[in-house]
C-alpha cells in the first residue's frame, strides 16, 4: 500500500507540475497508458478552465492509475462518457462509483442498450451490464444521460456530437458503441469505442458519416476486428489513437510478430495505405495532445 501511495503521489506531482490549466484557448487530451498490458480504453480531457471529461476509463486494472490522474487534476469530473458496456471500457468507472474517495462525478453519458440486447451475451458480461445499469438507476449523486445520434452539447468550450447509438438490430455489444465527436476551433477527435464492421457500415450509410471527419480518430476495437477497410478509407482523419496493448498491436501472443489470430497488422497496413504516419499507442506510454 505504501508503494502504491508513493507511485500515485509521483503521478500527481508530475501532472500538477507539467499539465495544470493555463490561459490557453484549447483543451488538453491525455491517452492513458496501459497499466498491465491489457485491453482497455481510457482518455481524460481538461478544458481551458479546468473542467474534466473522461472517455470510458478502462478495465479494473486501470482503476488506481485513473483515480490518481483524476485526483491530481482536481477530482471533479464534469462528464463521463461510456461508449458501450464491456468491462474493459467501464469497470474502472464501476470501481470509482463504488468507492469514490475524493472523486465527484456530475454527469454520465451513454447509449443504454435494450434488455433484449443485454441477454445476447451470457455470463460475466451480462451480469456486469446489469450491475452498471442498477447503479445508474439508483444514484442521486450524478445525472445519467441517454444519448442519441444528432445530440449536441457543449462543455466549457468543448463541443460534442453523438454520431451513433445502440443498435438493437445488430449482434454483439461492440456494435452498440456510442460514437462521439469532440472538437473546438483548434482540433477534433472522434471516438469509435469498439464499433464493429456492421455498426461501422450503418454509420457509413447514415447522415452522420460526414461528421467523422476529424484530426484524431480512435481506432475501433483496439485497432483490430472493428470497423472495416471501407470505413477507414472513407473516413477523413490525419492521426490515429490506438487504445491497444503490445500483444494486440503486434498480433503476438508469445510466438512472435503477427503469429496470433488478430487482424491488427492488416488494419495497420490500411492506415499506411491511407498515408497516415501519426499514431499514438497506449502501450508506449502517456500521450498528451494540446
Question: Which residues fall in each region the model found?
Answer:
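Hydrophobic helical h-region of N-terminal Sec-dependent signal peptides
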Residues: 9-14
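C-terminal motif of bacterial Sec signal peptides marking the signal peptidase cleavage site
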Residues: 16-18
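Positively charged n-region of N-terminal signal peptides that target proteins for export
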Residues: 1-4
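Active-site metal-binding motif and surrounding structural segment of the metallo-beta-lactamase
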Residues: 48-53, 60-111, 206-224, 236-241
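Active-site environment of divalent metal-dependent phosphoester hydrolases
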Residues: 38-39, 60-62, 85-91, 114-118, ...
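Second-shell loop/turn segments in exported
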Residues: 31, 55-59, 79-83, 110, ...
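Binuclear metal-ion centers of metallo-dependent hydrolases, dominated by the metallo-beta-lactamase
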Residues: 107, 113-174, 239, 244-290
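Core dinuclear metal-dependent hydrolase active-site scaffold
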Residues: 20-75, 140-213, 286-290
Amino acid at each position: 500500500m505504501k508503494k502504491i501511495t508513493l507511485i500515485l503521489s509521483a503521478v500527481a506531482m508530475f501532472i500538477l507540475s507539467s499539465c495544470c490549466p493555463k490561459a490557453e484557448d484549447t483543451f488538453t487530451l491525455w491517452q492513458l497508458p496501459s497499466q498491465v498490458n491489457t485491453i482497455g480504453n481510457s482518455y481524460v480531457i481538461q478544458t481551458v478552465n479546468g473542467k474534466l471529461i473522461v472517455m470510458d476509463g478502462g478495465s479494473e486494472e486501470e482503476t488506481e492509475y485513473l483515480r490518481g490522474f483524476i485526483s491530481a487534476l482536481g477530482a471533479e469530473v464534469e462528464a463521463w462518457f461510456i461508449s458501450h458496456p464491456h468491462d474493459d471500457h467501464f469497470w474502472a468507472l464501476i470501481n470509482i462509483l463504488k468507492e469514490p474517495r475524493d472523486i465527484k462525478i456530475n454527469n454520465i453519458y451513454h447509449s443504454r442498450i435494450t434488455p433484449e440486447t443485454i441477454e445476447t451475451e451470457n455470463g460475466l458480461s451480462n451480469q456486469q451490464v446489469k450491475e452498471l445499469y442498477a447503479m445508474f438507476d439508483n444514484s442521486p449523486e450524478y445525472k445519467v444521460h441517454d444519448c442519441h445520434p444528432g445530440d449536441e452539447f457543449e462543455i466549457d468550450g468543448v463541443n460534442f456530437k453523438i454520431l451513433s447509438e445502440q443498435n438493437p438490430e445488430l449482434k454483439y455489444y461492440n456494435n452498440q458503441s456510442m460514437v462521439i465527436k469532440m472538437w473546438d476551433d483548434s482540433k477534433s477527435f472522434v471516438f469509435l469505442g469498439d464499433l464493429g464492421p456492421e455498426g461501422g457500415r450503418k454509420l457509413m450509410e447514415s447522415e452522420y458519416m460526414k461528421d467523422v471527419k476529424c484530426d484524431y480518430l480512435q481506432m475501433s476495437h483496439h485497432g483490430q476486428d472493428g470497423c472495416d477497410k471501407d470505413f477507414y478509407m472513407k473516413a477523413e482523419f490525419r492521426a490515429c489513437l490506438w487504445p491497444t496493448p503490445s500483444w494486440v498491436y503486434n498480433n503476438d501472443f508469445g510466438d512472435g510478430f503477427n503469429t496470433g489470430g488478430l487482424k491488427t497488422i492488416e488494419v495497420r497496413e490500411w492506415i499506411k495505405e491511407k498515408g497516415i504516419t501519426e499514431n499514438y499507442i497506449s502501450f508506449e506510454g502517456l500521450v498528451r495532445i494540446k
